[in-house]
Curated annotation (Swiss-Prot):
One example GO MF annotation: arginine-tRNA ligase activity
Known EC number: 6.1.1.19
Gene Ontology BP term (one): arginyl-tRNA aminoacylation
Keyword rRNA processing: no
This protein's UniProt keywords: Aminoacyl-tRNA synthetase, ATP-binding, Cytoplasm, Ligase, Nucleotide-binding, Protein biosynthesis
Compartments where located: Cytoplasm
Subunit and partners: Monomer.
Motif ('HIGH' region): 130-140
Primary enzyme class: ligase
InterPro entries: aa-tRNA-synth_I_CS, Arg-tRNA-ligase, Arg-tRNA-synth_N, Arg-tRNA-synth_N_sf, ArgRS_core, DALR_anticod-bd, Rossmann-like_a/b/a_fold, tRNAsynth_Ia_anticodon-bd
Protein name as catalogued: Arginine--tRNA ligase
Amino acid sequence: MLRIAQALDTQLREAMQRAFPDVDALLDPQLAPANKPEFGDFQANGALPLAKPLKQAPRLIAGAIVEALQADPAFAALCLEPQIAGPGFINLTIRPERLAAEVSARLGDPRLGVPEVQSDAAVVVDFSSPNIAKEMHVGHLRSTIIGDSLARVLEFRGHRVLRLNHVGDWGTQFGMLITHLKQVAPETLNRADAVDLGDLVAFYREAKKRFDEDEAFQATSREEVVKLQGGDPVSLKAWGLLCDQSRREFQKIYDRLDIRLSERGESFYNPYLASVLSGLKEADLLVTDDGAECVFLEGVNGKDGKPLPVIVRKSDGGFNYATTDLAAIRYRFALAPDGDGARRVIYVTDAGQANHFAGVFQVAKRANWIPEHGRLEHVPFGLVQGEDGKKLKTRSGDTVRLRDLLDEAVERAEADLRRRLEEEGRSEDDQFIEHVAGTVGLAAVKYADLSQNRITNYQFSFDRMLALQGNTAPYLLYAVVRIAGIARKGGDLEAEAGMLQFSEPQEWSLVRELLKFDAVIAEVEEELLPNRLCSYLFELSQVFNRFYDQVPVLKAEGQSLPSRLALCRLTADTLKSGLGLLGIATLERM
């Protein structure tokens, strides 16, 4: 009901100005959704803060506002008579015919009443970001699916979204890995398919062990890094092959999860690192400390009480993550052709990186690399834990590979489906079972994560996420199938424009819940919390169930039949759209 809320807010402000033309204070109606259905649809609390400047009782002030409101024909066409409650709250109820008109407008509208923003400025969403030569593991799950969902919501709102994958494709680790492979398996550096990612990970572990224990190997590895940074063709070819091999494996995961990303790794920003230092120097922020060049943070002190530094060049002359992140921020906000021209940059990483980003963001702001009204945001998330409350691991104590986790989810979904089909005496072919199990399994993993407040840790449980009851993906997928089936049974019967008729309280509850969709999308866009959308979809399914259980639909008479079928269709469309914004595909049958 965003359009209605915006119209009401304008009408209230104008009424307050007419009622109190001499008040210098800001006239804010403080309009918000009503806390309880008996209070109407909205509540305006703006009379209370005016009591002191006007030296009047809030109820008298509310009465004057209501009187001015009722003189406005546009308000009279929108709302029933306002009610003053408590110390001076104004309760507002939207006219039933206006609510019915809003439902009618959303029927067949693919946007379901969600307005599009009018802006060409890019929004960058930086998410997933695995490391080359390492397999994606459960730790990449949250960044990947939270980032994808936020990107989908922002795109739906009409933003030009850059989905960037800031892969770890540069640094000392490549020097040691290339050196190790040259010595023990040179054939792996001839072509990208000479080694699979699992073997590459094993080689990486061997290289790391040698690097930690062998000073000669360490020195050779550092020489290899210098060659790589200097553009040595042999080193660059080896590096490119390693990146290609990892990239192919990452893409298999992304394709499976229906994730779209544009890779722009750390190496992309190499040409811009020197200018980061010169820019910080020009801004008079750069300080040399123990041979390292850094920026000391304001308001962030260490245990010794001294300001903490953000090091941008180490004492050995090398750059680090902070330098690369500063170069990325500068590039992303810079106008084309020098950058992306973004006005909002969102980083989706684990909460453990919060201090790092807080420091880097402060430096970027003090260097004036963030344009006026530019937004730089860190979207932190907690850990994925096992049911024992500890970090999710395999039985052997290793990190869970993301591929294995997804495989198990699909296998368990298939086992559940086959068991249910047997209990129901249904026979389905393997193609149907494979499709449904694949959809449900991946949906369950995504929804279990997205339905949690991302800031907290959450316990991973296949049993809970695959349950057909409760706030789960299988429950919502089944709700879509069921509701769409009810609508189909109604055939092509549709209510004529302007002829929707609702009389039962269960109908009005469903109408009001359906009309919240645009406000929920706006909230997710602003707060970057996908769990708000999950909570809404689950509540919508619950409200629909009460409506369908208590009010006849297919046996309804007169204009009630097409009107109630319209509610079924709009509910199915809203659930499908909402799940789609979470990256979850729906099914025709289960």
